[in-house]
Structures are given as structure tokens and as C-alpha cells.
């Protein structure tokens, strides 16, 4: 192979490297305390390639997942299961989710599984991704691999006791 052709090929490869590196940026995340739970490994190894039109990205922490560029969906597995909460709790496809809307003015929600051990938490930019799409994509994995604790969503009306009937 002529030397000039090899030099040209090397220059072409070097010119492409920055573009390839930009396509494979890793999302920086923090693992949860229980990230080494085998149930999390089962879920992470089966995460979908795409959710709500957002493509999966590499992360730098165990038991995490990310989708979108920039990342609009972040998943962390291995959190402690939440106890009773004042947050809205919404069941979807056999999985109960606590919904934290405290950052809704910035298009952000945090969804946390309720009644599953360990818990999964999703950070969501709802301007870019649908919470229904996320729940639909992840519910089968959560049902199959995260054991239910027996806790379920309930509302204040579920807990109210009827007023006693006056005695005649």
C-alpha cells in the first residue's frame, strides 16, 4: 500500500474520532446504596433500547440507565423502598408509582416505585418523554424482577372510616 494512501487513511480515521466520541458520551450518575442487588442487575440487563422516542445511553454507575441526548430519562435501581407518603401514588400496569411533581414548573417529575424492594426511581423531563411510555416500558421488568412488599397505593378516601350510625 503506498505511503500516501496510508497517511490519508490515518488522517480520515483521526478526523472521524471526535465525531464518534461525541456519539458515545457517558451519562454521569450516582449509584443507589442497594445498586448491587441481583434484582437490579436483572432489570438493568433487560432495559429497552428506546423509551418514548429517546435512545438509551451509557451511564457510569451501577444499576442505572439513561435515555435521550441530552438525557431526559434517568433510572436508578437499588433505593430503599419508600414508606407511607403524602405524594400522589398512581398504579399503572401492575406497578404503583409515587409521583413527585415538586419540579413540574421545570418540566421535571420524579417517579418512584411503591411496594417493591428494592425501589426504582425515574427522573423524567416530561417535555421530552411521556411518563405513560416510561411506565409501560418498565412495568413488565419491575413486575417480573422486583418482589412486591405487600404495600399498595391508597388514597385518603380508602382510609376513611364511615361515620357511626346514631343509636335509635
Please name every model-derived segment.
Residues 1-12:
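Bacterial N-terminal signal peptides that target proteins for export
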Residues 28-79:
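N-terminal secretory signal peptides
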Residues 79-86:
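Short, charged/polar surface micro-motifs in flexible loops or helix N-caps
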Residues 88-168:
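Extracytosolic low-complexity repeat regions of secreted or lipid-anchored proteins
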